[in-house]
Amino acid sequence: RSGCDWSSDVCSSDLLQSCGFQPLYNIESLSGFIVNEPNNKSESSLIIYKGLDGALKPLSTSNNFIISFTIDEQFEDIDIREDEKVLRKNIAISVKFSIKKEIDEEEIFTGESLISSAYNRVAEPYANFVAEQDTRDRILLLVIQDIKRQLALFKKNQGK
């Protein structure tokens, strides 16, 4: 690269910093969190737990935030024809979570992630099963990403 390109990168970086731009995620944004294993051992609860536990990094001190969550799944038939044949099915997954201080167990934040999606129903039962599993798995990944964003924002606001 030429020196001109390098100086424009530095100028761009300086400009973004002077405007107050800071990326949401950095090395510290998801550190200092511990997720409690859910009492409900459903497949969805365990997927959420593993997804969060793998992304969150506890601190070596006892100054961590403890996350607890509950999950609610709802399945609804939509797009029903006059002959009562269901053409689509909707899945909605809601995860409510709370953050407590590890030191004194004081609840300091509550949040919720609600994601829904639908899939087409067909005459083949196995195809419906696969479509439902794929849709549910996709929703769970989106819920995990949403909760991680909320935790990063929480952590960022704690520093202010």
Label each region the model flagged:
Residues D53-A55, L59, N63-E112, S116-D134, ...:
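Surface-exposed short loop/turn segments
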Residues G20-Y25:
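N-terminal membrane-targeting segments
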Residues L15-S18:
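C-terminal motif of bacterial Sec signal peptides marking the signal peptidase cleavage site
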Residues R1-C11:
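Single conserved hydrophobic/aromatic residue that forms the stacking wall/gate
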Residues D9, G32, N64-I66:
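A residue-level signal for beta-strand positions that form part of recognition/binding surfaces
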Residues R136-K160:
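C-terminal or internal capping secondary-structure element at the end of a domain, subdomain, or sheet
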Residues E28-K50:
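Post-signal peptide N-terminal segment of mature Sec-exported envelope proteins
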